[in-house]
Amino acid sequence: MNSIIEFPLLDRTTQNSVISTTSSDLSNWSRLSSLWPLLYGTSCCFIEFASLIGSRFDFDRYGLVPRSSPRQADLILTAGTVTMKMAPSLVRLYEQMPEPKYVIAMGACTITGGMFSTDSYSTVRGVDKLIPVDVYLPGCPPKPEAVIDAITKLRKKISREIYEDRIRSQQENRCFTTSHKFRVGRSTHTGNYNQGLLYQSPSTSEIPTETFFEYKSSVSSHELVN
């Protein structure tokens, strides 16, 4: 696993051995080694965090200190299926995090909805429809080594970014905020995809009401059951 991180340039020295750098580089250098994550787990992918806390992978050596309050976190790791009822809560947690903040989407269910999105009308098909995602971590579930690799990639991204550009990009590409209201739109998934071309609309809709009830009254209940 390649864990080499390009740290910001802090080695520009003068004749008096004074280090000179930019405020953006200094901020990135301090943040990439002290990420405080908020763990948002809803299903089996979240169990992999138990392995990360152990001595084998040593979650703390990257400066990661799990927090229970979004106001103290700058990274949120989403793991598991997100339903429509949970969507406002997830967005609210993200909105309460201070800037700059980052998101790691962990597992197939978080990224695409997974197997639960096949026939379910209440599953969010990708957490990036709610909040902006910085690192995608596929798997079902991802191994602890993959989680460490995702954190390493996020640290590389932080070391190269400019804070002003990130804020501007988030404002222009905003996904959803709690101040907005849900709008009832056209359904993109009806659940009838398995029927395909064999699906036919009920023929009774074309029969006049009077004709239908006259036929129903002339046929016994036993014949209707058969």
From Swiss-Prot:
EC number in record: 7.1.1.-
Q: Name one GO molecular function term.
A: iron ion binding
One Pfam family cited in the UniProt record for this chain: Oxidored_q6
Q: Which residues bind [4Fe-4S] cluster?
A: C44, C45, C109, C140
Enzyme class, UniProt record, top EC level: translocase
Q: Please provide, in alphabetical order, the Gene Ontology terms of the cellular component aspect for this entry.
A: chloroplast thylakoid membrane; respiratory chain complex I
Location of this chain's protein in the cell: Plastid, Chloroplast thylakoid membrane
Q: Which NCBIfam families match?
A: nuoB_fam, PRK06411.1
Q: What is this protein called?
A: NAD(P)H-quinone oxidoreductase subunit K, chloroplastic
